Each structure stands twice: as C-alpha cells, then as structure tokens.
Amino acid sequence: MAEGYDAALSVAEWLRALHLEQYTALFEQHGLVWATECQGLSDAGLLDMGMHLPGHRRRILAGLHRAHAPPVPLPRPAPRPVPMKRHIFRSPPVPVTPPEPPPTAGEDEGLPAAPPIPPRRSCLPPACFTPTSTAAPDPVLPPLPAKRHLVEPSVPPVPPRTGPPYPQASLLAKEELLLPSVSPRSQPEPAETPSTLLPAFPQGPLQPPSPPPCPPVIPPKPPRLLPEFDDSDYDDVPEEGPGAPASVMTKEEPLPSRVPRAVRVASLLSEGEELSGDDSEDDDDHAYEGIPNGGWPTSGLNPPLRSLIPDLPLHPMDELPGGPTPITPVIKAGWLDKNPPQGSYIYQKRWVRLDADYLRYFDSNKDAYSKRFVPVACICRVAPIGDQKFEVITNNRTFAFRAESDVERNEWMQALQQAVVEHRARFRLSSASVLGVRGSEQPDRAGSLELRGFKNKLYVAVTGDKVQLYKNLEEFHLGIGITFIDMNVGNVKEVDRRSFDLTTPYRIFSFSADSELEKEQWLEAMQGAIAEALSTSEVAERIWAAAPNRFCADCGAAQPDWASINLCVVICKRCAGEHRGLGAGVSKVRSLKMDRKVWTEALIQLFLHLGNGPGNHFWAANVPPSEALEPSSSPGARRYHLEAKYREGKYRRYHPLFGNQEELDKALCAAVTTTDLAETQALLGCGAGVSCFSGDPAAPTPLALAEQAGQTLQMEFLRNNQSTEVPRLDSVKPLEKHYSVTLPTVSHSGFLYKTASAGKPLQDRRAREEFSRRWCVLSDGVLSYYENERAVTPNGEIRASEIVCLAVSPLDTHGFEHTFEVYTEGERLYLFGLENAELAHEWVKCIAKAFVPPLAEDLLARDFERLGRLPCKAGLSLQQAQEGWFALTGSELRAVFPEGPWEEPLQLRKLQELSIQGDSENQVLVLVERRRTLYIQGERRLDFMAWLGVIQKAAASLGDTLSEQQLGDSDIPVIVYRCVDYITQCGLTSEGIYRKCGQTSKTQRLLDSLRQDARSVHLKEGEQHVDDVSSALKRFLRDLPDGLFTRAQRLAWLEASEIEDEEEKISRYRELLVHLPPVNRATVKALISHLYCVQCFSDTNQMNTHNLAIVFGPTLFQTDGQDYKAGKVVEDLINHYVVVFSVDEEELRKQREEVTAIVKMRVAGTASGTQHAGDFICTVYLEEKKVETEQHVKIPASMTAEELTLEILDRRNVSIREKDYWTCFEVNEKEEAERPLHFAEKVLPIVHGLGIDSHLVVKKYQSMEAMLLYLASRVGDTKHGMMKFREDRSLLGLGLPSGGFHDRYFILNSSCLRLYKEVRSQRPWSGAPETSHRPEKEWPVKSLKVYLGVKKKLRPPTCWGFTVVHETEKHEKQQWYLCCDTQMELREWFATFLSVQHDGLVWPSEPSRVSRAVPEVRMGSVSLIPLRGSENEMRRSVAAFTADPLSLLRHV
C-alpha cells in the first residue's frame, strides 16, 4: 500500500511533510531523490550523511517504519460508552470474570464468524445489545471517509481574495455529486457497496447497564488566557466526534490510550502528533479513518499524493466577476450545541452563523471574531445523527451540532444544503463567464506568528484585504481556519523589535515574529491590506467597462486593478510590482482603487478609448508564444518580459516612419490634432519627440497643438508622457550583463561579530554587547553565518548577487574597533566587527571580490571607504539610466560604467554643484565637476541615503587648511571665491572696503556657514553687507593654521621685500611663488588679482595700493602690523601683478572690461533707485484684521520683526508704555493658530512663506510678562511633563484622521523635544530623565515652529493647546497638536520653547526699545577707522582692529 500511495513522492515533499525540509539538499547530495530510495536508511547512515540531531533522525526513521511496515490485521475497537441525557446517569459496568475475558484484537482470525455489528450513530460509540431488546436496531449511517493528514503541495496554495482558502480537493472530487434531500424524519440508509461495510467490532456486554449511584465527575475546563477570544477550540486535537471522558470509565474498562485504533493508510507523511509535537492526541481523531463518507468509493476520495496537487487553482474565487462583493448577508444564525474537540459529553453552546460563503461559530452572538470557520465550498454532506443532532461533513473533518428541536435541526440542514448547492452553481457560472474570474491570488504574506493568548504559533495569511488565522499550515491548505480579520477596520502599530499590534474596534491582536526583518515585512503586508480594504472600486469598474481592460495587458490575469498611466495599459498587481522596477521613466504605476485623486475624468476616458486593446496592438504585436506571460509566471519571467516589451520595445509594431526623426515629429504634430490616440501612441513609442518643435510659434509643441485643437484626451496622453524614455534595443540593464559573466570564486571563513540586521541607517553607536559571535563562511557566492563552527544549519545567509554596497566604518565607530557594513537589495543592513585590523581588511577584500564583476575589479586596487553599485546617468546617455560601480576613497569618487571608458576620479571637493533633485520617493543626486555631470538615482533608499551622506561629507571641508577646503576649478577655495565674487559685484565702489569691519556676530555666522558648506552658501545683496563679507574673508585668511604663504616660506617672502633691485626682487617673488603648494599659489593669484581691481577704483572707494597693503599685510602674514614688511610684500605683488603672475595683455584687458561693466551697472541701478530690488511690499494689520487697520509696508531683506513692529506703531502714532509688549504675530486662519515672531527674526522669509490663509498682525502680547517672570525664576533650561498629544497625518495617504488625543510624556531640553509613551521611571527629576529609556519620537527643537492654538475641528480636550510644525530638509511638513491642562502650564511650555530656540534671549533689553527709528540698511557703511591720514595713524588703526574689533565701537 505504501508503494501505491507514495511511490511518486519526492524526498523534498516527504521531508516538507515531516517539517524537516532543511535536509532536502543533504539527501539529494547523496543521490536520494525519491522517498522509496530511503527505505534502507539506518540511524548510523543518517549520522554519516551529516544529520547530527538525534530527534530528527528518529522522526525520519519513524516515518520510514510506518510506510514500509507489513500490514497488520484490522483490530477491533473496544466498546465505547453511549451518551445519555444529562438527567440520566449510567450504572457502573458489570465486571468481567477472568475465565470469560473479552475478546482482544488479536483473536479476530480465530473467530468462526464476525459478531453482529452494533448500531452506531455516526461519531457516537456503538450501542450495546441487550437480550430483552425487541426494537429494531437503529439504522447504520453511511460510513465516513478516511481522514487524510498533511497533504501538502510543493507550492503554497493561494487563498481567494474575499476570504480564507478553500480546499481544492473537496471542489474537484465532489463537484458533480448532488446532496441528498433529507426529510424531517428520514434517516440515510446504508449503502450496499462493499466499501461501506464496517469492520467487525467486539460484541458488547449482554446485560443492560444499571444507573450509577452518582453522576460522573466532569473535568473542569481550563481557564482562558483571553476571555474574549480563547483558543479552547484550537487545540492540537482536530474536531471530530466525542469520546468518553476518563472520569466515567471504571478500572475494568480499557483506558483511552489502550483502545486499538483503526488501521491507517501507510504513508511516508508524518502523523499529526509528530507535527504538533504533542503526544497526547485524542482517540476520536481517528474515529472515521478508513471509513468512506456517504457510501462514495474510497478510491475516489483517496487519490495518490500527486493528484492532490493539481494544475488548476487551489482556491477558486467564488464571487461573480466585477470586483469584490459587499458584505455577504447572513442566511441563518442561532444558538446550537457543538461537540467539543476533546470528545467531552458536555456540549458547548455556540452562536452559529451561516452565510453564502462560510459557516462560522462564535462564543456568543456579540463576538466579532469566530472560533472556527468552515467554507461552504468545503462541505461535502450534511447528515442527521439522531435526535436534534446533525453533522457537517467536510473532506477532512466532521463537525457535530445539536439543535433545540428536530424542526430547528432540519431547518439548519436545509439551509446548509441549499447554501452548498447555490455555491457550486455560482462557481460553475463564474467559471463559464466570458468575463473570467480573478486568478488564484498568492498571499501577500503567509507564515507562522506567535499570537498572545495562544500556546502554539498560528499560521497567518495576508490576502487581499483580509488577515486570516489558521491553526497550522495544514489547515491553511484545507481552508478551515480560526477566523479572519477585515482590514477596513484594522490598524497596525510597531511595539518593539519583533512585535506588533493589529488593532480593531473589537480586539487587539498582539503578534510576535521571529526576527526584526520578518516583523517589518509583516507590517508592510498588513498596511497594504489596510490600503486595499479602504480602496474603492468605482474607477476600476468604469475602466473595466472596456472588454480588453478586464484582463492584465501583460499576463492576462482577470480583473487587474493597477495601471501604467503613461503607457495607458491596465495591469495586475504582480505585474505592477515589476513595472515599478522599470522606473518612472518607463512606466508610471498607479492603483485603480487607491490612487483616487490621480484618476481625473480625462484620464479615465483616455483608458476607455485607448487602454489594453490598442496598447497591446502596438506593444505586443510580435510576442512569440515562448516568451508570453501567464498569470502564474514567476517574477523573474515577468521582469524579463516587461524589460523587453517596454524598455527595449522588442515586441512593438514599428511605424512606417521609424528611423526618420524629422518625419516622426511632423506626423506626431499632425496626429495630436485628431482623435487618433493609437497613432499618437505608436509615434511616441517609435521615437517621436514629445516636445518637438511644431514650426508654429503660436503653438510650438505637440501639447500646445492639441490644446489649440481642443483634443483633451491627446493633451492628457502627452502630459503623462513628457518624461517617458524612448524604447531602445540596447537598453538592457547592465546588471544582466554583469552577472552573465562568471564571477571569481572566493572562499573565506572565520569568526565575525555581527548585530541583527536593520532596515534603517545606523544612527547610534552599537555597543559591544549588541554584537554576537558567529562563524562565517564565504563560499560559492554566499556569505553564511552559523551559531558556531560545528553548526550545520546556518542562522542566515547573504548572497553576493544581492549585495549592493560594502562600507568600511571609521575606527571606533561602534563597540569593535574595526567594523564594516553590508547592504543588500532587500533594503537590509548587516553590521560586522572585529578587533584585528588585518582580519577585518581581509574579510572586506574577500566580500568585495565576491560581488564586484570583472569590469569593475580595478576599483579593488586601492583601499576604499565605500564600494557598490548605483543606477545613474552620465556622459552622453542621459536619457537611459545604467548601473554604475562606485568606490569612494577620501574625497575621490571613482566610477566604472559598463558601456564607457575608464574616467578620471571625481574630485568631490572640487564640485561645482552638489544638489538633490526630485521628490522623496525618486531622489536624484546631481554632481557637477568641470564639464562632467553625473546623476545618481535613489532606487533603493537605504544604501542611497548612506551614499548621499558620505558623498556630502567627503565634498565638505575636511579641516582648516587651504588644501582641505572645498575647491573650485582652478584650485581656489570656494570660500575665497564666494567672498571675492560678491565684493566684485557689490563692493568695488564701497568707501573703505576692507578697511571697515562688519558686525562681529554677523561676520562669525557667515564664516561658520561658509566653513561648513561654502558651496551651498549664496551671498545676496540685501541679505549680507559687503563689510560683513570682507571681514569674513580677512578672518578666514588670518585664521589659516599655516597661513597663505606657509610658515616655512613666510620669512623668505618678508626678506625678499627688502631687496632693493626691482628686477631681482620680482624674480625672487616669482621663484617663491613656484614653491608654494598648488592651492596656496592659486589663492594668492586670485586674491592679488582682486585687490588689483579694487585699487583701480581707489578714487571712489579710497582704497589705493598702499591702503590695501596696510590691511592685508598683517592678515596674510599673520603679524601684529607694527612693521611694514608684510605690507610691502602685498604692495609689491599688487604693483607688479602682471609681471609676477605672468598675466598677458589680453587677459588684463578682459578683466578690466568686466570690472568696469559691473561698476557701470551698479551706478546706473543706484541712479534709477532699483538697487533694492529684493524689497517686498506686504500688508500688515494693527491688532486685528480689518480694512481700516491695514498698513502696506516695504520690507527689505534685513528687516526684523522688532523693526516692523516699531514702524507700524510709528505710522499709527501708538506710544509704547511701560510693560507693553508689542509683537508681530503670524496668524493662520485655517489652523486657527498664531505664532509670535521673535524680535530678531527676519520678516521677509516669513512673508514669502505666507499662504492665502495667513497674515501678519502687530498687537500686544499679553502673556509675555508672565513668561518672562517664569523664565527668570526657573532653574535649568529643561521642562518635562504630561500633555495631550495628537498627530496630524494621513493614513497611508488616504486623508483619514489618525485618532484623538492621547496622554504622552514630553521632555524638552536644549537640543530636542522628546515624546515618550509613558513615564517608566518614578525617580525624582535629575535634570536628565531622557537617559532612562529610548523615546518614541524625537525632534530637533530649533527646527520646530510653535503656534498657539488648536483648530476646533479636532475637538481638543482643553482650550490651552498649541500646534507644533516641523519642516524637514526636503521641505516636508509634519504637524502635531498638544494640549495642556491649564493656561499657566501652556505659558511655561511656550516660554521654554522660545528660550531654548533663541538661547535664552526671549525679549530684547530695554535700551534697544528706546530708539524708534528704523535702522538704515547700510548702517554698516559708517567708517570705523580713518580713511585718510598719516601712515602711522592707519597702521595703528589696523593694529587695533586685529586686537579687538569691538573696542572701535566705544565712540560711535
């Protein structure tokens, strides 16, 4: 029998059934492919094969023993007790004397004839015969089918969209079988076929049982872990007929464990107790084994294993085409008694509900989630089993129920039978429908999870908009589960590293995954289910009105609910994932159900007129059958097909004008003025320029022509294809070419210290305790890590083909001195560490060799800080992205492209531009150096953000020396270039330029920003004064550690100035200039060239060569200015600029012309009054927004909130009294909030950022006095406490509110605002409570804007609230609402915010409020040192400036 049943069983399927699939490769290595080949294995043989765990060996040998053991005679089961009414008690059984023992199972062959078959009521024990009984025995019900366990296909089945999966075997084997109609009093008659004969049973005792003296003791029910949702019905015992409890058996009766069981079919598959790991399996689990159901042939219900894995979909969809149906109405519901799975005599009351799809039962009629559900498609037969009882029989399980009366029992049976018949009719109708039905849908995520309240893991499947819970994988395949959760009422939330909560209005499901990676994958899948549940099918149904749009344009799957809006094709979910991989330049993927805002009426009409019909007529005109996709195609096949179809245009129908660009453009311009959308699609797909010139200046582009012709659909199609790439046959992704080359075989092994993988960049230092010691093996392109060197099964592995980046961390970045990071395509980051530098370096080199292709092996010749591949555009192929290999070493970025020559390294500190373009999802890093531009795309966010950070850091200034600064094309530091260029543009005619000093605070802020990232600083007139910029330049040159002329050559320069012979002196200068470092030499030339231009306008700026030398001599040579040697060198260099620096006449003439033109333009601008072009006129209100209170104010770039307030009060003649705190407020009417501007805050940026619902108001700030008193009396600069908190963000972008206000604990210190879910530490305040535990959220405090007030629409719990707005570097705004309990608490929080954000200066000191005049924009133009006088006076003034610039302000 074993041979007939399991002959075709492969080793992989057999081991999977035993839950030992990890040994599949081991068996195949030893030539064991089929299960029958394993018959001769022994314990020693398994050990020699490498199987070291004794429990696994015993499980395999037990399976072999069961499969190949000789058949045993059919045992006779012991007599079983008959259930009585609850008020009737059983008498103790009559003891059997030793001379007359009951027959045993081994005596069957010696009996002359089989004893009469006792009457049996389905799953109940056989009734005893009595000698005085005259009534006819109860009719025997048709025998039931043998239960088959653990039929597990090699590919996981796909549950349907609208509910849990249905067992396919029940649909296929019995689709044509009709259910018998059951009359109210009729009993099913036994079938007369031999297969229905029951095995012989031993005859029971002849005496009738006498009533017992006392009722049996019923074992107490174990307490529930969760009162509202226990797992008493989900024990490892399947739900079958009842068995006799141990408490009602006497010593003479055989114990349940000794009752012989029916013979099982020999099988290599493991038994239920081996899978569950529980040896205490109930006897009723086998009550019907070997007995077919309803007299149907056993052979029809017990096919070989492979026949249970058919080619048809395992879980057919049971609704009609047209999308998911609404909630199924309940057919019948009511209370029924249900036989428990433990076989107890005590029936349990259950609320049972039947709809068109499921039979479910609950603890009560108020429960939202069932204890069990049985798909109607799984029900084979419904049969009565006695008074008021009936059975629901599936292909694998039998469920027994008892009603209050026979009438109710018959009503339930009739409803169930009718539901089954109608379900099968619907299935036949949907299968035959011309529209087709949605193909079997793979679960978005399926696997085992721990659920709080359950002792064993549950099998969880996320399919469509439901989360389904099953007891194990077997039940998932059978379709009979615990419950399912509709995600339209669900929300998922991360709890800790491995746990998350699924919250519904009825219950919180707390799940735990095996790893942090699995948890994030489950979160993503469940969030997708929520999005799908909250979607609408209105757009989909409209687009499906066109027949071709009802099937996926690529694989043919029915009812596709995604689309590519630029290609104008409707696609299924699985193809949509691969379309996204093509990039937005090829396919812009949108959902028909979730992206509702995208689907304008014009776009819907475009899909109805174009869509899949004409689309495939063009794109798929030449698809060979061997390359066509099917709904079941693998992701790899889809990816290959879609690359060829849309990126390369391999299967497209070529236009007759293909290859003639000019004619294609003309034809496109003609086509867009007509309604022929297919022609427009064909022209664009064959290379016509979407923005080509039409020849008509009034309508220069095809889009303008379509608009002129009133062709709305043509306009929509052209807009969607503005950035679409033209298909090219040579556009195969370079990665495919990379990996077609055999990579070198690298092998390495050893111990590494490893942390858990992360899905986010590592922001914090990982302590040594967070690392685990692992034995790592790199072999055959796989990096595997084991628990130790003796372990056989790896804890995990990283394939070299999936590695996208390898980074070496700086020393002591983490707990180990040497660490490196590995990034994979799955957005995971692995951190490894070692103490030994040589071992760490060897590991890095081996891993790099394993994943870098031969074309980029030159990158391994030098040590690198980061190595990997990134999609980019460079050179002449800017239309097509390619995969480039990059290596970062210091400030050099070396790149290798698959189809390009080796290029010089990119000097990051010499970049002309480093910027980030695009939105948060499609970021592009732009690097511009000399004549090269490189666009690096952020296809994978994790490694892209890491690359972005290190490139920005490498491109920034590394130190204070000149060579460590950001450099320009000619090796001039960007700081010097920015300052010199600004002064050339704005300060050549400024009187006393370089002699006057700017404001110290502004100068320092400007210099700090220039030192941090000079490339991103753009100096603008009106925002920075020329004296501030000139002072910043002088301070930068003076603070150089080595000086501009270097410490080694400084003395030689000073000595050269004393040479009397001019020619010899100039020659010496030129000689010294050659010996300067390249950056110093270029900087000296640029600076002297600038000073030469400044002295050309000495008549206006009063800065001749001598005056400039007095200023720059001590600055460049870092002297005290008491002698003139340093000044003499500068003066000589300016006077002999042309000779010393070898400037030809043409260059000198061009330089003079440029400078002269700049000065003329400034003079013309000053005469016409347009020098303040940056000023802005804004409406400001006094006290309230009324027409009579508005003032139109001209706001220059330098105006502060204090200056604006004073000007408004001056205009209205409002006097400021003592303790009047007039302030300018930014009022947002939409948010019902306002923000008092800080007195030093610049107004112009705020005015530019005001929306239509915002305005500025000058009014008294009533709370300022109380806030100042609080700040004066408080201790420390921190605040903490509880507040009501609400986050204002959309749920998955659907615009749904995120809930109400919740209590949260906040800590505000000098650097950040932190949010905690609860207060964990009860210790007294120590000034640093934030160290007690990690916060739930954290924001930098200086980047927050705090508005007083919360809009009433949110129903704040108190009226003392404020709104916090945070704007990220990408200009993304996030908003939160906080409420305090009292007004005083609100004032304290707001005062602390202002104090922290402005370094304690909340309100200006009193003297600064006395002056009512608006400061002059050019106040800094006042001369602070004499412009004329003797040389000694000038020298003394410069020396005083170098000593203390602020001392010069004493007499001003």
UniProtKB/Swiss-Prot annotation:
Residues 1174-1263 form the Ras-associating domain. Residues 329-421, 442-531, 745-852, 1276-1398 form the PH domain. Residues 6-70 form the SAM domain. CDD domains: ArfGap_ARAP, PH1_ARAP, PH2_ARAP, PH3_ARAP, PH5_ARAP, RA_ARAP1, RhoGAP_ARAP, SAM_Arap1_2_3. Residues 228-239, 271-286 have a biased composition (Acidic residues). Changing residue 87 to P: Significantly reduces interaction with SH3KBP1. Residues 956-1141 form the Rho-GAP domain. The modification Phosphotyrosine is found at residues 234, 506. The modification Phosphoserine is found at residues 232, 430, 740, 1430, 1437. It is found in: Cytoplasm; Golgi apparatus, trans-Golgi network; Golgi apparatus, Golgi stack membrane; Cell membrane. Changing residue 87 to A: Does not significantly affect interaction with SH3KBP1. Interacts with SH3KBP1/CIN85 (via SH3 domains). The interaction is independent of EGF and does not affect ARAP1 GTPase-activating activity but is involved in regulating ubiquitination and endocytic trafficking of EGFR. ARAP1 competes with E3 ubiquitin-protein ligase CBL for binding to SH3KBP1, preventing interaction of CBL with SH3KBP1; this is likely to regulate SH3KBP1-mediated internalization of EGFR. Interacts with TNFRSF10A. This is Arf-GAP with Rho-GAP domain, ANK repeat and PH domain-containing protein 1. The lineage of its organism: Eukaryota, Metazoa, Chordata, Craniata, Vertebrata.
